[in-house]
């Protein structure tokens, strides 16, 4: 009997269950590391078909999750992240197709050189091994993480939030169907089959050495816990306090379009703008139109004293507002002294995630892009492009804001490490 079936009938303790899942994933990782690209792509193609064929079941399961979340009084932003629609399910399938079409990173020789003694040294991409993904409300993370780990030759253990449990299970069923059609082990993509929160602690401990890296996708408290307690490396961002700076040289219509999209396209995503910075030199031309547009679009604006004067609907900003990830239709706004003032504000209040400048002045843009210490910096584009799909990665497993190994959207290539292959002809070291 498999570990997952033991969990369902309640005959195994959680520690035993999780340890077994880790061992099975480790065994699957050894198989995936050697799987040819064609076999992995066959699995991905079958997963894409299964997601489309199983859309009704996925949506029905999600509807139950959403009903429970509404009954529990969750926020509108949370419900948006939890809710699947036919379009979002189709986007999952399309994302799988894109991942299938990207180059397989495993085995790629990134560098090669020959030493004076005749040895050839190659640096080659290899899988990380077993990736644990701990996430909260977004059920589509199950699909994104599963297919990216498969493409990069990694086994993955998925631990979704209890609120999205049914949705994740329905999606996982489709992924496993694809694995089976391609002759790959079920344990290549494992879903923790329990809502028990103690499972998270066991994952953070590494499952007796089975887990190589952890990726948390969720709120500040989850990510902070993972970074504090994990005994294995973590790819994570704590929060997305993202800024849009509108320079004095900015085209007003472009600025309005970018600011509105950055804040209001989807307020609950980590790439949403949370603070609007406007060049003091553009206050008379740009401030009122931007603030009025946001408020008229249903966004609450919290501003400094100057911003409050342009529209009576602006609420006073507190010190905490400059450090807040709202994930809702709320934005903080203030004037700054040019690009230097914007950079200084972001340095003091940013989260190293995503920040944008709207400017026609290429020197101001270059200064911003060069000096803002964030994983993603944009010139004349919305912060909502902070997404692996928009980078051409097909999907992302998360956005890393640290400075080791992976930074920015974590796609298939970022889920590999490297080893050195050395070819000799009998050389010995003197």
Swiss-Prot record:
The processes (GO biological process) annotated in the record are: L-proline biosynthetic process
Q: Which GO terms describe its molecular function?
A: glutamate-5-semialdehyde dehydrogenase activity; NADP binding
Q: Name one GO cellular component term.
A: cytoplasm
Known EC number(s)?
Answer: 1.2.1.41
Group of enzyme by EC: oxidoreductase
Q: Tell me the keywords, alphabetical order.
A: Amino-acid biosynthesis, Cytoplasm, NADP, Oxidoreductase, Proline biosynthesis
Q: Which PROSITE patterns match?
A: PROA
| Signal peptide, first to last residue | none
Subcellular location as annotated: Cytoplasm
SUPFAM superfamilies given in the database record = ALDH-like
Pathway-wise, it operates in: Amino-acid biosynthesis; L-proline biosynthesis; L-glutamate 5-semialdehyde from L-glutamate: step 2/2
Query: Where on the tree of life does the source sit, at the highest rank?
Result: Bacteria
The protein's annotated catalytic reaction(s) are:
L-glutamate 5-semialdehyde + phosphate + NADP(+) = L-glutamyl 5-phosphate + NADPH + H(+)
Regarding protein family, the annotation reads: Belongs to the gamma-glutamyl phosphate reductase family.
**Function field:** Catalyzes the NADPH-dependent reduction of L-glutamate 5-phosphate into L-glutamate 5-semialdehyde and phosphate. The product spontaneously undergoes cyclization to form 1-pyrroline-5-carboxylate.
What's the protein here called? Gamma-glutamyl phosphate reductase
